[in-house]
Amino acid sequence: MNFGQLKAYLLELIGRAPSDLCYALVTADINAALRIAAMEDTATLTEAASVTLPTDFLAMVSVYRDTATRTPLRPTTAQAINNVHRTSGTPTQYAIVDGAMLLNPEPDGTEDIVIRYYAKQADLSADSDTTAVLTKHPAIYVYGALAHHAQLIRNMEAAAIWQSQYIQAVKGARASDSVDRYSGAPMEPSVRVAP
């Protein structure tokens, strides 16, 4: 489904076109709270003490140094990096601060770092625009836009109904995502040893 199809569907369903604000609010809701595989993207960055993240970065899924033997980096806090900061070496950990990934120790070289991350869903403006969530889970946008529309026109009864449907659509997307990620197989624990 694209933005034009979504608008046409809602116009047919309720007999009026919701404000563009409704669609912007749904996209903001999705970016604030939803994290599913359809929202994931990959980027290859060059390591440095501070690496600028993609502009659509929401949250990290995984990160590794792309060397002969892939070396995963562990997440930590900026405070923890400051406490054990080293000015040179092979990075083993990272922290996210103000749109950048800080590496510790600071790298000696310039290896590639591959990140898998949750990407922001773009705002919809042209009729041909779509997002991964709109394509795979259109009910989230349908019910979210209807809930925001009902709130804007102060129809709280309808808003409660549409909000309930929106919550169900989000739960359905998360359940579907879980099945897709693990192919229906049970998850197996991975034992790690503390350094």
Per-region residue spans from a language model:
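Glycine-enriched, solvent-exposed interface loops adjoining structured elements
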Residues: 1-195
